[in-house]
Amino acid sequence: MADLQTQMKQAVAAAAVEQIKDGMVLGLGSGSTAALMIQALGAKLASGELREIVGVTTSFQGEVMAAELGIPLRNLTAVDRIDLAIDGADEVDPSFQLIKGGGACHVQEKLVASRADRFVVVVDSTKIVDRLNLGFLLPVEVLPGAWRQVQGRLAELGGIADLRMAQCKAGPVVTDQGNLVLDVSMAGGIGDPEDLECRINNLPGVLENGLFVNLTDEVLVGQISDGVAGVRRLQRRE
């Protein structure tokens, strides 16, 4: 039997797929929960429950998985719009601001989320926090030749930034865009995500950071009640 966290992820993945309609262009996110959603989508396409779906992936890993499941794919530059994007998150605060980028895919993830008419985030209950960056580091993608300079500038903003090192190869993590990632801890967490997102992105050498501000329309939260996995729906108030 799957552990409780996996059960929560499976529940929200299934709930997210229920929002998909025939003919949609979908943003297919990255990470473990999004992977379960892609698997569930593939099963519905194979059974004929869904038809004429086109996916836009946010990572090479997601592209490989979707292709193996027979999900038709297009590049982001080949679509005029995205009806619905579904993705996971590393942290979600009460204002629906996110930290993403644990898998170093946040640049493409943010491009897809910002293009979508609706952006739905799927997480288990462990990802809901009162304040961002107290438990998860903020990823910042930087040009390879600029990481030392950016590291120093982030320190001026009150952050401690470490170069992310790879687990299965020697040297640092290299993103799909060929860049490096700094993982940042801000003293006391992030109180104003919108301001910090702008400040970091204005630093020379920074491509993008993992703060997703004012993009999320709905959060589906997997939770366990009386030993049974269920889903809580949180919708942003305009």
UniProtKB/Swiss-Prot annotation:
It is an enzyme of class 5 (isomerase). InterPro entries: NagB/RpiA_transferase-like, Ribose5P_isomerase_typA_subgr, Ribose5P_isomerase_type_A. Coiled coil: none annotated. Pfam families: Rib_5-P_isom_A (PF06026). GO terms for molecular function: ribose-5-phosphate isomerase activity. Pathway: Carbohydrate degradation; pentose phosphate pathway; D-ribose 5-phosphate from D-ribulose 5-phosphate (non-oxidative stage): step 1/1. The active site is at E109. Substrate binds at S30, G31, S32, T33, D87, G88, A89, D90, K100, G101, G102, G103, K127. Catalyzes the reversible conversion of ribose-5-phosphate to ribulose 5-phosphate. Homodimer. This is Ribose-5-phosphate isomerase A. It comes from Prochlorococcus marinus (strain MIT 9303). The gene is rpiA.
